[in-house]
From Swiss-Prot:
Its EC number is 2.1.1.-. The active site is at residue 410. Residues 5-63 form the TRAM domain. The keyword Iron-sulfur applies. InterPro entries: Methyltranfer_dom (IPR025714), MeTrfase_TrmA_AS (IPR030390), NA-bd_OB-fold (IPR012340), SAM-dependent_MTases_sf (IPR029063), TRAM_dom (IPR002792), U5_MeTrfase_fam (IPR010280). It is an enzyme of class 2 (transferase). This is Uncharacterized RNA methyltransferase alr3654. SUPFAM superfamilies: Nucleic acid-binding proteins, S-adenosyl-L-methionine-dependent methyltransferases. PROSITE patterns: SAM_MT_RNA_M5U, TRAM, TRMA_1. NCBIfam families: rumA (TIGR00479). PANTHER family: RNA M5U METHYLTRANSFERASE (PTHR11061), TRNA (URACIL(54)-C(5))-METHYLTRANSFERASE (PTHR11061:SF30).
């Protein structure tokens, strides 16, 4: 088949040779690239072309002709349908190889670093049963049964679950029971097309070290007759459940949580032990979903920095202080910068609760706060959202020249972009790059880059 005759709907044979950063298998056909979900390098497959462009196409696995040695039987019975995990069909050791390769490729292609010093991927506990948080959209089946699960790949159709192998198994009993109770009380499920109904999502969260659980219903406006009574029944039925909340989200939006969260039974937070400190974690708090690996990455950061107690540290995008507070015990002063006022309030409470008094928190956008700090910190910790750092943040760092920067990223493409800017003209040098598997069974990877101010950076 020549390049000009490739059409949507055709079946083609492809040898999968790589994985994309979104988790799809990548092969070539007629000098063009083909992206195929649910495949593994080493697979020989028959692919149905779905979306065809001049130089590439997206296809669907039609038939597995020859399996890769890295292909395994998924540990989840709905892995082929559910959009929650992309890689349950891939041997875990190969997942780690692929993630390290993904980091190296991005740093080379986007960052322009010829030989980035990328360590093997950091792992800790099991690659299943690790998630401390689950947020399930709800739906109603054709027979009127309440369903909760994850969206089917490429759609908003809910794949109904009673358990999920990547979630902490202590959350599974609540998933099945809450669906049953919603059904019995005949509470209306939200219909996103008509913007009618009430219950949009079920949120479950657990302290991995304490076992405490929070249950949250995300609702359109909260009109659920008998919800307070039902919340008390849930607390009595499940001793590990410490709080039930309603989050109000009245908007036509794909955002899960709205701005207003109200505790209707128990307490509005769970307690979690992280790095030897006790944190209060609320339903809508950002907290890494793999507690053990997040803690292991913090230990790498502590070891690499080797703080001596005289330093000033700025933690940009600090959230509730998950990294700020443990590191504050090793420096003279720590300053956390965070856009969300609610997160800063929690960070202050967490600091007070743990008796930490050498830390302060400031509310505001990092790109506005950092240039006005008026100090040259010894260490700056960056942990931005997926979009990476604003250009003003990079320029501020290049102007103030802190001796060391630790950049933690959940999207390696934006990390590579920002590192390229920071290392322009040799101002900073990459000392080490440590990736960590915060999201086993998916294509996502967390990365920490350690930068030091070079001699030329000091001289300029």
């Amino acid at each position: 088949m020549t390049k000009s005759t490739w059409h949507q709907g055709e079946l083609i044979e492809v040898a999968i040779a790589d994985l994309s950063d979104t988790g799809d298998g990548v092969g070539r056909f007629a000098e063009r690239v083909v992206f195929v979900p649910d495949t593994v390098p080493g697979d020989r497959v028959l692919v149905r072309l779905l979306h065809v462009k001049p130089n590439y196409a997206h296809g669907k696995l039609h038939q597995l002709l020859e399996p890769s040695p890295h292909r395994i039987r998924p540990g989840c019975i709905v892995a082929d349908k559910c959009g929650g995990c992309q890689w349950q069909h891939i041997d875990y050791e190969y997942q780690l190889i692929a993630k390290r390769h993904q980091v190296i490729q991005a740093l080379q292609r986007i960052g322009g670093f010829a030989q980035p010093p990328v360590d093997p991927v950091l792992v800790t506990a099991s690659s299943l049963g690790y998630r401390n948080k689950a947020t399930y959209p709800l739906d109603v089946s054709a027979t009127g049964q309440v369903q909760a699960g994850y969206y089917q790949k490429g759609s908003h159709h809910v794949v109904n679950l009673n358990q999920c192998p990547v979630q902490d198994p202590r959350l599974n009993p609540l998933l099945a029971q809450v669906k049953q109770d919603i059904q019995q009380r005949d509470w209306p499920i939200y219909d996103e097309k008509r913007h009618q109904g009430q219950i949009r999502h079920l949120g479950l969260r657990i302290g991995r070290r304490t076992g405490e659980i929070l249950l949250t219903l995300v609702v359109k406006d909260g009109n659920l007759p008998g919800i307070e009574q039902q919340a008390q029944e849930w607390l009595q039925r499940y001793p590990q459940l410490v709080g039930v909340s309603l989050n109000r989200n009245p908007e036509r939006t794909n955002a899960i949580f709205g701005r207003e969260t109200r505790c209707i039974a128990g307490v509005p937070y769970l307690r979690e032990i992280f790095a030897g400190l006790e944190f209060q974690v609320r339903p809508d708090t950002f907290f890494q979903v793999f507690t053990e690996t997040a803690e292991a990455l913090l230990q790498v950061i502590e070891s690499q920095l080797n703080l001596q107690g005289h330093e000033t540290l700025i933690d940009a995008y600090c959230g509730i202080g998950t990294l700020t507070l443990p590191l504050s015990k090793q420096v003279r002063q720590a300053i956390g910068l965070e856009l969300q006022p609610e997160a800063v309030q929690q960070a202050i409470v967490n600091a007070q609760h743990n008796g930490i008094n050498n830390v302060e928190f400031q509310v505001g956008a990092v790109e506005k706060l950092l240039p006005k700090m008026g100090i040259i910190p010894d260490v700056v910790l960056l942990d931005p959202p997926r979009k990476g750092c604003d250009r003003i943040v990079i320029e501020s760092l290049l102007a103030s020249k802190p001796a060391r920067i630790v950049y933690v990223s959940c999207k390696v493409a934006t990390l590579a972009r920002d590192l390229k800017l920071l290392c322009t003209d040799g101002t900073y040098t990459i000392q080490r790059i440590q990736s960590a598997d915060f999201f086993p069974q998916t294509s996502h990877v967390e990365v920490a880059a350690f930068l030091v101010l070079s001699q030329s950076g000091k001289d300029n």
